[in-house]
Amino acid sequence: MAHPAPTDPAAPARWTVEQYLRLVDEGVLGPDDKVELLEGVIVTMAPANLPHDAGVVRVTHALIRAVGDRAVVRVQLSLKVGPYSLPEPDAAVVPGRIADYDHERPTTALLVVEVSDTSLKQDRLTKRALYAAAGIPEYWIVNLRDDCVEVRREPEPDARRYASVKIARRGERIELVGLPGVSVAVDDLLPSPPR
């Protein structure tokens, strides 16, 4: 759902990252506004629920343990992927060291992860197209509805899609293509089934 734009008739039809950040700096958008910039549109993020929160915690812990100091794991922080998009993925593994991002946002990632319950359609369509167009080599959707992880690889930026899509299930491991030798168990990413 698009966030209502400021009532200024001169507001652009498509917001740039710089214009969006100015709205944040000027207090037009605040911390209580759960929005992100996708393709120049200010979009309301799906509200978090307990399964989503549990998934984010599990993904965070699993990635930090697996990646160690070979890259940086960022959680629900913005990623600048072009002049019109500043998504806030649930997790991103970015190259470099923590200090590399003290004064600037990352513009790429080795892996982006969305934990998906109520946002599955947007994560499969809008976010997939956005991350593929940015050339992000690997995109996982931790699909809470179907209790699996959708692994997308081999981005085709011009087509805004991934050539490879695999479903990973409990009992399997997923190796990160950007960090050879690093893998994560699917069971560590998915919340435990309800009792």
Region locations from a protein language model:
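Gly/Pro/Ser/Thr-rich low-complexity, intrinsically disordered segments predominantly at protein N-termini
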Residues: M1-R195
